[in-house]
A protein has these predicted regions:
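Acidic/His-rich, metal-assisted hydrolase cores and their charged scaffolds
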Residues: 1-160, 164-170, 184-250, 254-478
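Catalytic glutamate of the conserved HExxH
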Residues: 173
Length: 478
């Protein structure tokens, strides 16, 4: 089941070079350490067992631990000219036979437990019963956020008080899904452990209202609905929800997900017949036919190595969101055995993943590494040109935008810069955390739900009708 980026075609032979040559431009020989780093789940973060067992209980009382943030001083601009630890493009070694398993997104045992019950709110707890106490209703809540036959909604925090709704579900910690959630929110929120940690850290929501769902385990909600969270292959902490209503209907809400093979290999699909699926249709268009993440990562590593031969003193800047894109920069750090420089707020977020090996790769000191992670908006030609001036020890900066939104042609198989100057190269990488059109089709044909409801880019009646015809065709073909 493990996703091993290093098994991609010819990648080992292209990167695993043992020779240590003198680099005249650097005046020193730099050889990457051939050490094996024992790390968890950056790319193989689901370890699925085919056998489903029934356990007796599930503990929901564990307190969430916020990350312990160290506070080293930021790098001094006066030391910006200090020579960085450049690698030689001819002496890059893979430090491990397998891709670094940074970022322990999930420990997915594949076990279904008996339906442990969540406690109901006490009648004398006015704050709990008061429900949403934050912002006022900011529009009508879309129908696809309500789970039929239950008192549950998914990713619906920006619509104010919703009558008859007892429980709120958060699929992952991206702002378009938690928008409207604040420290004043006082209704039960169900999510993964990582997402709960981020909600507590960043939004200061009272931990009493955060209920952690263990992956691949059934739990019973106060209204009698059973729910199971399963990995969504989207970003750390992202999950899909399967609801089993009191009338026996199985409803899947995907949230945002990437339906690569690792998702289809989850044996839950063999155990449960899905009646209704609320489907992430972000890229439900034949034009969006981008490669699998492991292929994109391999291509990016090839591009970087080739770039280093032209510009040995290369600075690499990768755009990222608050959470997401970890696989991309972790793969680069592993291939070239370097630190990962992140901003202080990003460090706090990554510490919520509770991954010691990842922390060992991280640094706040820009002078310590040539691999910097910055917000997407900072990766532009103008900003990177100015950024390079601050660090004159580098001769060129490669900006990487790992998102399908950033590229002009989503069907191209080879990576090509979309903007390049003497000082800056901008590379759009079709690294998506949403399903491609082909992956959506394969998922639908595999799960074969009775009804499909699109949740993205489906606000118009004509669009919904067109998607319905597409879904019907997929099921007929499959």
């Amino acid at each position: 089941m493990a996703f091993d980026v290093w098994t991609h075609k010819d990648l080992k032979s292209r990167l695993r070079k043992r020779s240590s040559k003198q680099d005249d431009q650097l005046g020193a020989s730099v050889e990457a350490k051939a050490k094996r780093v024992t790390q968890r789940s950056i790319t193989s973060f689901i370890k699925i067992k085919e056998k489903f067992v029934v356990s007796t209980s599930l503990d929901y009382s564990e307190s969430l631990q916020s990350s312990s943030q160290t506070s080293p001083k930021d790098d001094d601009l006066n030391n910006a000219s200090r020579p960085p630890p450049f690698p030689s493009s001819d002496s890059v070694q893979i430090t491990s036979q397998r891709q670094t398993q940074l970022t322990a997104f999930f420990t997915c045992s594949g076990e279904i437990t008996s339906r442990a019950k969540f406690p109901e709110a006490k009648s004398n707890d006015k704050k709990v019963l008061s429900g949403f106490t934050g912002r006022k209703n900011s529009g009508k809540c879309p129908f696809f956020k309500f789970i039929p036959g239950t008192s549950c909604v998914v990713d619906a925090f920006m619509y104010g008080y919703l009558p008859q709704i007892q429980m709120y579900f958060l699929s992952h910690f991206h702002s378009d899904h938690y928008s409207g959630l604040s420290r004043r929110f006082s209704r039960p929120i169900y999510c993964s452990k990582i997402t709960a940690s981020l909600v507590a850290l960043k939004l200061k929501v009272d931990r009493r209202f955060l209920h952690v769902l263990e992956l691949n385990h059934w739990s019973t909600l106060p209204d009698g609905t059973a729910v199971m969270a399963i990995d969504a292959n989207h970003c750390p902490g992202a999950v899909m929800f399967i609801f089993k209503t009191k009338n026996g209907e199985n409803i899947l809400h995907t949230g945002d997900f990437r339906a690569e093979n690792i998702i289809l290999q989850n044996s839950v699909w063999e155990q449960i017949r899905i009646d209704v699926v609320f489907l992430d249709t972000t890229y439900c268009n034949p034009e969006y036919d981008f490669p699998e993440q492991r292929v994109v990562i391999s291509q990016a590593l090839d591009f970087i190595q080739a770039k280093m031969k032209v510009h040995p003193k290369l600075l690499i800047v990768i755009g990222a969101y608050t959470i997401g894109k970890e696989r991309m920069f972790a793969a680069i750090a592993e291939a070239f055995d370097c630190k990962i420089c992140v901003e202080r707020l990003k460090m706090q977020v990554l510490n919520c993943l509770d991954d010691v090996p990842l922390r060992e790769r991280l640094t706040l000191q820009k002078k310590d590494t040539f691999l910097h992670v910055m917000p997407m908006a900072s990766v532009t030609k103008k900003k990177l040109t100015e950024y390079l001036k601050v660090y004159p020890s580098y001769e060129h900066v490669l900006g990487i935008l790992p998102t399908a939104w950033q590229i002009g042609s989503v069907k191209r198989s080879l990576l090509e810069p979309f903007e390049e100057t003497n000082a800056v190269t901008l590379l759009g990488v079709p690294y998506s955390e949403h399903s491609s059109y082909v992956e959506l089709k394969r998922f639908v044909q595999s799960v074969r739900p009775k009804r499909i409801i699109p949740t993205v880019n489906a606000s118009g009646k004509e669009t919904r009708l067109s998607m319905a015809q597409t879904f019907s065709r997929w099921l007929t073909e499959g």
